[in-house]
Amino acid sequence: LVASIAINLSRLGLDLPWAFNRKEKKDHGEGGTIIGSPLTGRVLIVDDVISAGTSIRESIAIIRDNGAIPAGVAIALDRMEKGGNAEEVTETSAVQDVEKTFSIPVVSIANLTNLLEFLKSGSDAAQEFTSHTEAVTAYRNRYCA
């Protein structure tokens, strides 16, 4: 996801450094968990989805540990899940919790409400997926803020 964003920004004349973190540290090749440019200055976190916000919190810790500043978060899909953890669930969303806790903006391309609107739209593009509407609605009723 980050590489495709960097490519498109480059096409717009914006040559920005980028990096990503591996889930597991490797002891060969480049080693470590950060691949790409060193983390310096203000860093935008890019992720495919936000659920509880755990990976965002981990990314913020990695950025700070490297002396950089988390500037914001861009995500493809906000699942609109309640924030908190296994012991304590909040009534606010994980996105709202991240924004409040770290004082950074979180923006998404789409959220679960958008997905449900698409599934219920009756459009030709949605026809293949309408069978999932009930399951997505049940998920939203159970887990979302």
Task: For the regions a language model picked out, list residue spans one by one.
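PRPP-dependent phosphoribosyltransferase catalytic core
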Residues: I62-A145
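Short, well-ordered, mixed-charge alpha-helical segments that flank or form enzyme active sites
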Residues: K26-E30, A52-T54, M80-G83, L116-E117
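A broadly conserved detector of short glycine/acidic/proline-rich loop/turn motifs that flank catalytic sites
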Residues: I5, I50, A110-L112
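Fold-independent oxyanion-binding glycine-rich loops
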Residues: N21-E24, D47, L77, I109-N111
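Residue-level signal for the start and early helices of compact helical domains
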Residues: K25, G29, I34, D47, ...
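Short, glycine/charge-rich flexible loops or terminal/linker lids adjacent to PRPP-binding catalytic cores
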Residues: V2-V43, T54-R57
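A contiguous pocket-lining binding segment that forms or flanks enzyme active sites
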Residues: S37-E81
